[in-house]
Amino acid sequence: MKTETPSVKIVAIAADEAGQRIDNFLRTQLKGVPKSMIYRILRKGEVRVNKKRIKPEYKLEAGDEVRIPPVRVAEREEEAVSPHLQKVAALADVILYEDDHILVLNKPSGTAVHGGSGLSFGVIEGLRALRPEARFLELVHRLDRDTSGVLLVAKKRSALRSLHEQLREKGMQKDYLALVRGQWQSHVKTVQAPLLKNILQSGERIVRVSQEGKPSETRFKVEERYAFATLVRCSPVTGRTHQIRVHTQYAGHPIAFDDRYGDREFDQQLTEAGTGLKRLFLHAAALKFTHPGTGEVMRIEAPMDNALKRCLQVLRNAK
């Protein structure tokens, strides 16, 4: 088995990288290297800050000089990434906007935002492979694996802090499009129902409406009506797990092809109508936020994929 030995790297810590732990910083620098190996080189003193040994919990300061030793990466570990090279290349085609502070992409349905839970490939891993020179790439928020649409990534720690503050202060507006069962009543503009998250024995997350849950609110607007379905715009005020999916179900209008909260008869109707749909019809259509560097208010829209467009066209033609 061949191995590849990179050279020693000296990295000067910029102001926006200060405050993070050295172990977390090394994970962004040594992409694909197991955590166990990172802790091993820290323990053995192979990583130095300002020529001194440090502990994994050491917090970096602006101006620190970090010595990163050569790390041997086995060829067979690299081979494990190769099946995903096409997915990595495909990510380049779905970038909607990019500058020195942020990157925004139109996440495809079926791709997780993070590897893990049995998935070796996620959007963030793909972006790091696509942008090996990027010193910082972190998700600002998440989308469910089967949800497509606008996904915001920070390219600086200062940008991540600013955008997270906007999320906390409800300064970020997200708009989703969902195809739901039946005729959504126009007077139902808001669903307020507390949500409780449960973890099943299988490890699967299920969310249900419960008075013991966290306060949750979603606003709705009818976009288009069809014979047995409605396209609604959903704007979550809070950001709970599976919030839109559970709130539409609670309102009596589950989303098309939702394998956890959906309705199989509705899915069958869509299949028999010839829509060709096989994925969850939930799309993050737009995101409005204040740019962390310029202060400009931005609204970025993501077009629907061909599967969703085709489904709507078939339903329109059948009206």
Curated annotation (Swiss-Prot):
Class of this enzyme: isomerase
Stretches of the chain forming a coiled coil according to its record: none
E.C. no: 5.4.99.24
Name of this chain's protein: Ribosomal large subunit pseudouridine synthase C
GO terms, molecular function: 23S rRNA pseudouridine(955/2504/2580) synthase activity; pseudouridine synthase activity; RNA binding
Pfam families listed in its UniProt record: PseudoU_synth_2, S4
GO biological process: enzyme-directed rRNA pseudouridine synthesis
Record gene name: rluC
Family designation: Belongs to the pseudouridine synthase RluA family.
Keyword Transferase recorded: no
Domain S4 RNA-binding as annotated: residue spans: 20-83
UniProt keyword Signal, yes or no: no
Free-text function comment from the UniProt entry: Responsible for synthesis of pseudouridine from uracil at positions 955, 2504 and 2580 in 23S ribosomal RNA.
Catalytic residues (positions): D144
Signal peptide start-end: none
Source species of the chain: Salmonella typhimurium (strain LT2 / SGSC1412 / ATCC 700720)
UniProt-listed SMART domains: S4
Annotated PROSITE patterns: PSI_RLU, S4
Catalytic reaction list: uridine(955/2504/2580) in 23S rRNA = pseudouridine(955/2504/2580) in 23S rRNA
Keywords from the UniProt entry: Isomerase, RNA-binding, rRNA processing
